[in-house]
């Protein structure tokens, strides 16, 4: 059972840092209509920024930044969160420190499957676009339709809790199907291809090539009924992190908690109930971080398992 938030947090008005995928781009286009500007891109390892803009002055969108100086908004399953962070799972009481250890697996299967671009509509009280194609773009971002196919009960709970019965009806009746085919055609035309994890085209892009994405973003803005995009900023590497996958257990929770309190944890999320991906500002060493070091080695030896609801 999801616990609806009693009060919604305000969305800070700051330059944006986005994730380098379709959900990040759709989130940017949506917030651009409300006056937001793009200042950076984060690929979960390196933070790219416009010259002269500080990350601490920005809002990270479709990203779960763990550093307390960078406010962020996202929908991933977290272990820790700064006061400046807006996270869908935490708003609805799914991801909390009390869920760690024996309750983690049970909590993880209830994690939020809703893309950030859709989350932003809900958070700001913006009505959904009536056009089913525009809705389909929001659903395609972060593969909500695939999550529904695999984990219908969880997706159903979230969409009903957010008041999105219309999307649920269209998912269950498969009326988005022709629009998904159109989206695949558009993405394929711009050179986006399937990945080993997803059998349909994704929209990952290199942050260093952000300006070259302009033709695609112009088409995407037109498809969504947004204002045309005339330019995109050139961004440069500003902050290089060290990214790891770790086998999760209570000892890892305690060790990462220290990294979080010492401001060394840049971002993190649970990708399985027993696996956490982290980006640290200081690389791990066997001598100073034995618990986390061993958790990385254990994770490398694990067999690949099916991903839980995302």
Spans of features found by a protein language model:
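Fold-independent oxyanion-binding glycine-rich loops
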Residues: 20, 44, 61-64, 75, ...
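Short alpha-helices
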Residues: 83-161
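Active-site-adjacent bridging/hinge elements
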Residues: 1-8, 94
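N-terminal ordered "arm"
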Residues: 3, 10-56
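Active-site cofactor/cluster-binding pocket
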Residues: 49-50, 57-106
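C-terminal accessory domains and tails appended to enzymatic cores
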Residues: 9, 128-310
């Amino acid at each position: 059972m999801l616990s609806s938030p009693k009060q919604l947090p305000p969305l800070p008005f700051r330059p944006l840092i986005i994730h380098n995928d379709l959900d990040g781009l759709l989130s940017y286009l949506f917030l651009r209509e409300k006056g937001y500007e793009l200042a950076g891109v984060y690929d979960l390892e390196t933070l790219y920024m416009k010259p002269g803009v500080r990350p601490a002055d920005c809002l990270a969108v479709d990203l779960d930044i763990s550093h307390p100086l960078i406010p962020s908004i996202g929908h991933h399953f977290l272990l820790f969160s700064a006061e400046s962070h807006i996270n869908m799972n935490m708003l609805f009481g799914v991801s909390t420190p009390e869920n760690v250890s024996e309750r983690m697996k049970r909590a993880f299967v209830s994690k939020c499957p809703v893309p950030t671009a859709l989350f932003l509509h809900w958070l700001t009280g913006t009505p959904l676009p009536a056009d089913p194609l525009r809705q389909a773009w929001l659903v395609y971002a972060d593969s909500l339709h695939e999550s529904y196919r695999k984990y219908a009960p969880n997706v159903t709970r979230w969409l009903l809790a957010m008041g999105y019965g219309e999307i649920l009806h269209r998912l269950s009746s498969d009326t988005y199907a022709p629009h998904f085919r159109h989206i695949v055609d558009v993405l394929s035309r711009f050179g986006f291809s399937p990945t080993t994890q997803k059998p349909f085209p994704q929209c990952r892009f290199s942050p260093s090539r952000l300006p070259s994405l302009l033709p695609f973003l112009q088409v995407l803005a037109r498809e969504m009924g947004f204002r045309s995009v005339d330019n995109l900023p050139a961004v440069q590497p500003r902050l290089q992190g060290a990214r790891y996958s770790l086998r999760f257990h209570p000892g890892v929770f305690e060790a990462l908690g220290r990294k979080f309190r010492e401001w060394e944890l840049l971002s993190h999320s649970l990708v399985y109930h027993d696996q956490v991906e982290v980006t640290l500002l200081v690389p791990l060493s066997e001598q100073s971080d034995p618990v986390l070091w061993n958790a990385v080695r254990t994770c490398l030896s694990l067999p690949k398992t099916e991903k839980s609801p995302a």
